[in-house]
């Protein structure tokens, strides 16, 4: 199974000029350093505003970098009177291939529930977009030993999603789903769980996916939370960690590519 290294730019950079410099550095870095990166998929998730210029830069350079959006509308897969939303169809038309759903920041600030996330999953599937579903526990839940309980509740959206897929969408989930385990207490804090802890949690996630449908046994399960070049090799050494969702380190081309190299080995 190929690894996935996904850069979530969040609300960065602040100017188009900075975006253009970053994507240029990434494309040139991939061309110069990682042409032989056969074991790793690379993906960028810029803000909605910067999807178009990033896609144009990738197309102009025939880059193998994939493009993801950081969110997608739950209200419509196509169009409608939903001010501020961006639909799966609009994203697909822009060249987006994947969407991030359920990031802890959206769960926290926008109070996104499993019911909302289910709609986003279904809308993405309707347009053939892949989904990176983020799950993770708070520090208090982690310290109380409630990690598995929280993850089980958050993963239930996958069970509901599978039940609501249309017959013609059979096979969608096993080809277009990535689970990103991001402990909330590790995101941007510098606190990092041990590789052993993440490995054990990923095994639990796989068990839950298998209980929903054994065809999900090959679903990539990746880790996110203060991933840096300094710790990437440790995570890459675990056979249960199929890649990483990178935040701050994705805003520097050298750092992002250094992480990618760890997962190409």
UniProtKB/Swiss-Prot annotation:
Per the UniProt entry, the Enzyme Commission number(s) are: 5.3.1.1
What's a Pfam family in this record? TIM
Read off the SUPFAM superfamilies from this record: Triosephosphate isomerase (TIM) (SSF51351)
Q: Which reactions does this protein catalyse?
A: D-glyceraldehyde 3-phosphate = dihydroxyacetone phosphate
Entry keyword set: Cytoplasm, Gluconeogenesis, Glycolysis, Isomerase
**Recorded metabolic or biological pathway in which this protein acts:** Carbohydrate biosynthesis; gluconeogenesis; Carbohydrate degradation; glycolysis; D-glyceraldehyde 3-phosphate from glycerone phosphate: step 1/1
Residues annotated as binding substrate:
8-10, 188, 226, 247-248
Q: Which GO terms describe its biological process?
A: gluconeogenesis; glyceraldehyde-3-phosphate biosynthetic process; glycerol catabolic process; glycolytic process
The GO cellular component terms are: cytosol
Q: Which residues form the signal peptide?
A: none
Please, which domain of life does this record's source organism belong to?
Bacteria
Gene Ontology molecular function, alphabetical: triose-phosphate isomerase activity
Subunit text: Homodimer.
Q: What is this protein called?
A: Triosephosphate isomerase
Question: What taxonomic ancestry is recorded?
Answer: Bacteria, Pseudomonadati, Pseudomonadota, Gammaproteobacteria, Moraxellales
